[in-house]
Amino acid sequence: CVMATPAIENIVNFYNGVQITFIGSFVSIEAMKNHPKSVKTVVLDKKYSALYKTAKNLGKFDAFFSFRSSFRTKFLKFFIAAQNKYQFDKNKYINCHQVKKYNDFVNDALSIDTTPRKLKLCMQNQSSDVIQKPLLGINPGASYGSAKRWYPQEFAKVASELSSQYDVIIFGGPGEKDIAMDIEKLLIEKGVSNYQNLAGNTTIPDLINHISKLDLFITGDSGPMHVAAAF
């Protein structure tokens, strides 16, 4: 969802006074729910009966945009009541970055010619923390499992080397608590104490807020990588 944010901003700029209902997975909704144009959010159930019920209960829209090309989203689109419906076609937009693919999709749908701007995520108002030292975030998780994951000892080595210049925050989802704990143990062995291990203990909005305050972020190919690119 993060890589669709420039395209979403072009939709916002196209429709005067637009109000947006965001529909999607729990993670995508958590990331987008603080958008200033959001008036409603709906987390989708994967069951087709639930998709049908959701579509029928949402009411009418002037336009419906789907940035997914799965059969489920086509099913949802069919039953959504909207004057205009647009669906991303992954077979049409190829050989370019995902951000540009989504932006080209919106350009074609609205017959406009815009270039994608910076990724954008909106946060709730957060209290300003007093930061004593620059912050380094490390995120050992990666999309598609261990094949794209760097070793815990390598993360720990880098974090240890940089700990004199940065305070360290370890990030990770519930499924990455073990690897985060391995990194924490290695940091303790190296005498590093200026760290926090937040793996498995952040909501999506919390994660976005923490990442927005980092000075340096080291991660594999992951969702938090795309979040960091927005700041």
Give the location of each predicted region.
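Catalytic machinery of carbohydrate-active enzymes
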Residues: 1-231
